[in-house]
């Protein structure tokens, strides 16, 4: 089948799909839109067969425009498109020189999508379904890339990746465990985690000035590791569309990572919140070093809860979270069975 042409006000994009009216529009509305377009551009055809053929090309162009503009609305494109007088023409019929050259970055992304499909065994029932899934995949990819850019710049303490669920909406991802049980570690497990920490230190050239400093940093590292593991467990069971990983910032606090200290007022408020929480749950610690370590874990828990609740406000989570008496414990320290399961 001949390629179909989308010619915009300032550019042309080629489509190889003959489209039906989009589901949200009635056939009568789309037909009226086509008739209005014909009048606007003085279009007439020698036969009903020719008009039917041209309308199919116009529909494909219209669909492409709407999909592009949806991406633009989501920040995935830097411009919007519109249908003009060449929207019912094939590539061969468009005047020479009006078709744009393919952008290398688009070809690379298309290749990446094809490789991802192959890797995850993805097939779709129609070109329309594939186009829809690709749009979701592109949105996930953009979100992951933006996060990883922040990680490169030191604004995040972990990296993300694409997985099998990256072409699904949040509602479509199988609802699995919202929280994960990590059993209490025995001696062997603890030794494995200690070995993992030592390997991470060597990999990232980490040295600490004292055993107290190392204990503090290990506490932060464990909190980051726990958050990453819980997220990736949800990704495995389908509750997240990407995976995370550790990096050289995993032993740092949020303030250290971002390079931004809390303002005096903010710091005082957070400190007051921590002190209030300690009183509420009867928390005391044997040393200032231990308290500093527990406060870092509490801060990481608080941050995770706040981020989750922000997503809940935006409709991306179906429940809200709160900080409780386990908020200064790592997942390994929380008694077995106390993490909620769906």
UniProtKB/Swiss-Prot annotation:
Q: Where is the signal peptide?
A: 1-19
Localization of this protein: Cytoplasm; Vacuole
| Record's GO cellular component terms | cytoplasm; extracellular space; vacuole
Q: What InterPro entries does the record tag this protein with?
A: Papain-like_cys_pep_sf (IPR038765), Prot_inhib_I29 (IPR013201)
UniProt KW keywords: Cytoplasm, Glycoprotein, Protease inhibitor, Signal, Thiol protease inhibitor, Vacuole
Check the record and name the SUPFAM superfamilies matching this protein.
Cysteine proteinases
The organism's superkingdom is given as Eukaryota
The entry lists its GO molecular-function terms as: cysteine-type endopeptidase inhibitor activity; protease binding
Q: How is it modified after translation?
A: N-glycosylated, with sialylated biantennary complex-type glycans. O-glycosylated, with sialylated oligosaccharides.
Q: Which residues form a coiled coil?
A: none
Predominantly, its location class is cytoplasm
Tissue/organ expression: Expressed in the skin, liver. intestine, spleen, pancreas and kidney.
Segments traversing the membrane: none
Outline what the protein does: Inhibits papain and ficin (cysteine proteinases) but not trypsin (a serine proteinase).
The identity of this protein, by name, is Cystein proteinase inhibitor protein salarin
């Amino acid at each position: 089948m001949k390629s179909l042409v989308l010619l915009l006000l300032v550019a042309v994009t080629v489509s190889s799909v003959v489209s039906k009216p989009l589901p949200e529009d009635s056939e009568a509305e789309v037909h009226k839109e086509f008739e209005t377009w014909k009048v606007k551009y003085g279009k007439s055809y020698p036969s009903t067969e020719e008009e039917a053929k041209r309308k199919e090309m116009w529909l494909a162009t219209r669909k492409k425009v709407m999909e592009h503009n949806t991406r633009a609305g989501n920040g995935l494109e830097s411009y919007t498109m519109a249908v003009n007088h060449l929207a019912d023409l094939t590539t061969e019929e468009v005047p020479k020189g009006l078709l744009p050259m393919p952008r290398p970055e688009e070809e690379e992304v298309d290749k990446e999508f094809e490789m991802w499909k192959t890797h995850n065994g993805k097939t779709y029932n129609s070109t329309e379904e594939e186009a829809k899934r690709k749009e979701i995949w592109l949105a996930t990819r953009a979100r992951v890339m933006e996060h990883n850019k922040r990680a490169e710049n030191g604004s995040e303490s972990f990296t993300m990746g694409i997985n099998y669920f990256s072409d699904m909406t949040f509602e479509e991802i199988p609802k699995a465990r919202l929280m994960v049980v990590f059993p209490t570690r025995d001696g062997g497990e603890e030794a494995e985690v200690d070995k993992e920490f030592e390997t991470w230190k060597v990999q990232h050239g980490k040295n600490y000035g004292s055993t107290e400093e190392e204990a503090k940093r290990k506490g932060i590292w464990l909190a980051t590791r726990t958050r990453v593991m819980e997220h990736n467990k949800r990704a495995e069971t389908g509750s997240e569309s990407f995976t995370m990983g550790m990096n050289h910032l995993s032993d740092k606090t949020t303030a250290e990572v971002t390079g931004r200290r809390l303002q005096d007022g903010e710091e005082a408020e957070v400190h007051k919140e921590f002190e209030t929480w300690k009183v509420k749950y009867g928390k005391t610690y044997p040393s200032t070093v231990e308290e500093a370590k527990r406060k870092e874990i509490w801060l990481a828990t608080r941050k995770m809860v706040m981020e989750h609740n922000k997503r809940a406000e935006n409709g991306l989570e179906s429940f809200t979270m709160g900080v409780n008496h386990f908020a200064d414990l790592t997942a390994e320290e929380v008694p077995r069975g106390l993490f909620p399961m769906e």
